[in-house]
């Protein structure tokens, strides 16, 4: 079978990789001149700057880990201990480790009564039915009952647990008020906190897509080739891209949902394209403040997170600690990641100024940076508000035969959600009956090498 995959981010690359393992002929179309999407790296003056995704998350990324092991790349991942400072409103700082949720309980700002309340809440969640996979949209939908994360957190962890754990933690990951979010993901993370372990590929998260493409022999990769149209053609489809028409038997559509809606407009009902276009996205910005000589070589913490949303920014991250190869020898870069609500009133110049002020607040005086690099996306991260998972998951049954969707937006913005979705789309295409759980090793064992 000849299959077109539209979109060269992690979802599309994972779909192409899986389809080739199954013996299909695959054409992968990517509008940019490289694969990776929002995981891509930008190389500038000796720095390798991430355009979006920052890290992988250990045991809660089972499909990413499994594929990297198949590719022989898993052992190349570099552990990141992510020592974290929580900044209180009055300037006091408390230390924790981002990948060890229970380490937040050591913060002295939490009373013994508060710590017991949080520990009891976590213990209850461990024995309460909940999602076992953090990035399976169908499973998350089963535990999305309409409550939002703020009310859930205050009920389960209490006021201080919400202020000093949930707000900084989820503020870093998704940069929006926790009242905007369904609690299903955080519920899943709390249930699996012991499996968290942060890692980074040596060349940055964008290297995951490079590894997938390199590990997909026979892939027909078409870079700088945006797809203009998908039309029915007999028992298959014609994909129009780069001024050429490509007849295929099936299509996996893996760009962001607004682009997917445009491509599917003549193939599906208006209700389906509306669901795609209504998928909530955040205004997203981060600034890399780059120094060729590190002004703070003795600063220990990798991450600084505010314990409230009173600042414009939600995280500062030292690049030399997260990805040592990404800075020139003796250099440093600070990634300043912004909350979504303030961006509505901020120009790009305002964002850069606020980033420089954040660097001063967190790390202290420094000479002028050698350069700053702003990444600003009006449609940045997909936001899973209450009801999101069920609405998006229902789309799979609404696609015509031979058309499959993939993307992290079915769960939450993130590499695992994208890879899970891309692999699942390929398995759906390959199976006349509902596919086996894509986490199952049987899927890999049964795969036919091309």
Language-model segment annotations:
Residues 2-28, 430:
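N-terminal Rossmann-like FAD-binding beta1-loop-alpha1 element of flavoenzymes
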Residues 7, 79-81, 223-225, 231, ...:
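Short loop/edge segments at beta-strand edges and connector loops
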Residues 11, 34, 258:
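Conserved Rossmann-like nucleotide-cofactor binding loop
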Residues 20-44:
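Glycine-rich FAD pyrophosphate-binding loop
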Residues 22, 228-349, 362, 442-450:
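Mid-domain catalytic core of redox enzymes
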Residues 45-132, 137-140:
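Dinucleotide-binding Rossmann-like beta1-alpha1 core, especially the glycine-rich loop
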Residues 98, 316-450:
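Conserved flavin/dinucleotide-binding core of flavoenzymes
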Residues 124-230, 234-236:
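Active-site/ligand-binding neighborhood in enzyme catalytic cores
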């Amino acid at each position: 079978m000849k299959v077109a995959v539209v979109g060269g981010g992690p979802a599309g690359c994972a779909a192409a990789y899986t389809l080739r393992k199954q013996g299909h002929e695959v054409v992968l179309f990517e509008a940019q001149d490289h694969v990776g999407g929002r995981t891509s790296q930008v190389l500038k003056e000796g720095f390798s700057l991430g355009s979006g995704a920052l890290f992988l998350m250990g045991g809660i990324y089972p499909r990413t880990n499994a594929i990297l092991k198949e590719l022989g790349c898993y052992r190349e991942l570099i552990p990141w201990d992510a020592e974290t400072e929580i900044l209180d409103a009055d300037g006091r700082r408390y230390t924790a480790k981002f990948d060890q949720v229970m380490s937040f309980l050591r913060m002295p700002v939490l009373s013994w009564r508060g710590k017991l309340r949080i520990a009891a809440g976590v213990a209850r969640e461990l024995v309460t039915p909940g999602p076992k996979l953090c990035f399976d949209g169908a499973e998350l939908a089963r535990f999305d009952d309409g409550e939002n994360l703020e009310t859930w957190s205050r009920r389960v962890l209490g006021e201080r647990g919400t202020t000093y754990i949930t707000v900084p933690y989820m503020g870093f990951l998704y940069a929006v008020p926790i009242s905007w979010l369904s609690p299903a993901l955080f519920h899943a993370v709390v249930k699996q906190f012991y499996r968290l372990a942060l890692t980074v590929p040596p060349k940055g998260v964008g290297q995951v897509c490079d590894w997938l493409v390199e590990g997909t022999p026979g892939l027909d990769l078409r870079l700088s080739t945006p797809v203009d149209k998908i039309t029915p053609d007999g028992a298959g489809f014609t994909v129009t891209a780069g001024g050429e028409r490509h007849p295929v038997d099936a299509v996996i559509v893996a760009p962001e949902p607004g682009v997917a809606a445009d491509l599917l407009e003549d193939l599906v009902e208006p209700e389906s394209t509306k669901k795609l276009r209504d998928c909530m996205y955040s205004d997203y910005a981060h600034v890399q403040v780059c120094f060729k000589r590190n002004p703070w070589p003795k600063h220990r913490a990798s991450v600084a997170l505010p314990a409230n949303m009173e600042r414009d920014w939600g995280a500062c991250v030292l690049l030399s600690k997260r990805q040592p190869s990404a800075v020139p020898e003796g250099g440093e870069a600070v990634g300043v990641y912004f909350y979504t609500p303030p961006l509505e009133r901020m120009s790009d110049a305002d964002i850069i100024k606020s980033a420089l002020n954040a660097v001063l607040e967190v790390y202290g005086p420094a000479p002028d940076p050698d350069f700053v690099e702003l990444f600003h996306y009006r449609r940045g991260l997909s936001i899973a508000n209450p009801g999101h998972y069920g609405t998006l998951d229902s789309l799979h049954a609404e696609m015509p035969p031979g058309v499959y969707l993939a993307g992290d937006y079915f769960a939450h913005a993130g590499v695992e959600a994208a890879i899970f979705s891309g692999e699942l789309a390929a398995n759906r295409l390959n199976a006349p009956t509902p596919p086996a759980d894509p986490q199952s090793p049987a899927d890999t064992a049964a795969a036919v090498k091309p």
